[in-house]
C-alpha cells in the first residue's frame, strides 16, 4: 500500500509531547493520537525526518520481544540516535520496587536508585514488564490477583523516580505502541475511518493469554471514532473499566461500542477484523478448568475465509506472532484481506513518531 498521507498537501504539524509519559493511548487526546499517526505516515513516506540525532533510548525488557525491540532500535538508528536494550536478571541485576522491603532475597537494586540513574544517561526509557506474558496467566496469577497485576506497579514506580519520559512497551494492562501501529494501518487502508465498522474478535488459543494487547487494539479503533464491536463468547469480556473508558471516548468522537457473541452479524460488512486470543477474567486463577471449558469453542472461533468473505473487502489485522490454523487460517493470513505485514512494519514508523514527539525540544 502507498505510504502517502491522507492529506499530502498539509505538512504534518510537529508533535511536541516532550516530558510526557506514555502508558496507554488514554494518556493522549484523540487529536494527539491523530498527530502521531500523521507523523508516522510522513516518516514512512519520507516527507519528514525524526529529530533523534544524538538521542539515546534505554529499553528494559523483562519479557521477550521481537517486533517491539527491533522497531524501537531501528527507529532510533535510522534517525541518528541509539538504543541500549537490557534484560533484567540476565544482563542486569534483578530489580525491586516495593517500599520498605528488606532486600535479602533475589533482588539487588531498588527502583529508587535505578530510575534516576538510568534516566540521567538517556533521553527516554521504554519498559516491557508483564507477569502474564512469558510465564503465562497461570503462573502469573500466583504473583497476585488480576486487579493487583493490572496496577502495573513496577512501571508506575519507575515513572515516579524517572527524570525523562517513560514509554510502556507492554504491561499487564496496556500496549500503546501496538495500538498506535494498528491505528496507523487502519488510516492507511481506510482513509477516513470514522463510523466505519471495526470488529475485535476473540479466538481460541491453547493458552490463557493476557489482555494488554486486546485492550490496546480496542483503543486503536476507539481513538478513530469507529463503530466498534467486541466479538467474544460468553464469559470472555474485557476488563469492565477498560470497556467503560473506551465507550466514553468513542461516543464522544461520534462512534459506538458494543459486545456480542453473534459471529454472523459481527463479520457482516466489517471494514476491519482484528483477531486476538485472551484469557477469561472470570476464570482468572482457574486456568486448567478454563482450558477444559473452552475446548468446544476451538473449531468455531477461528478466523477463516468464509467469515472474512462476509466482510466484503474488510482487512484482517493481528499483532503477531500468530498460531496459523489455530487463530487464523493460512488462506486468510496469506490472502487479499491480510494487512498484518503492513501492521507490523508500522511498529517502526509509530515508534519513530513517538520518540520524535517525546524528545527534548
Predicted regions and their residues:
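Adenosine-phosphate binding glycine-rich loop
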Residues: 313-361
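Glycine-rich phosphate/diphosphate-binding loop of Rossmann-like nucleotide-binding domains
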Residues: 62-80, 187-275
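Rossmann-like adenosine-cofactor binding region
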Residues: 248-331
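Phosphate-coordination loops involved in phosphoryl transfer and adenosine-cofactor binding
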Residues: 51-57, 194-196, 313
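Glycine/threonine-rich flexible loop motifs
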Residues: 135-148, 207-211, 280-300
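Phosphate/diphosphate ligand-binding glycine-rich loop within oxidoreductases
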Residues: 52-59, 66-187
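Positively charged, low-complexity intrinsically disordered leader regions
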Residues: 2-74, 89, 174
